[in-house]
Amino acid sequence: MQLFHLCLIISCSCPTVQASKLCLGWL
């Protein structure tokens, strides 16, 4: 849950392909 929240924050702060890949990697 916390990782997902961090992912959302990162995506909002820096919406880039790299951020998306990191998010998918965490999920």
Curated annotation (Swiss-Prot):
Q: Which InterPro entries match?
A: Hepatitis_B_virus_capsid_N
From the UniProt record, which GO molecular function terms apply? Answer: structural molecule activity
What Pfam families is this protein classified in? Answer: Hep_core_N (PF08290)
Something else known: This virus has been isolated from a low active healthy carrier of HBV, negative for HBeAg. A genomic mutation in 1896 creates a stop codon at position 28 of HBeAg, without affecting capsid open reading frame. The HBeAg negative variants of HBV are associated with fulminant hepatitis, but can also be found in patients with persistent infection and chronic hepatitis.
Q: What is this protein called?
A: Truncated HBeAg protein
Native species = Hepatitis B virus genotype B2 (isolate Vietnam/9873/1997)
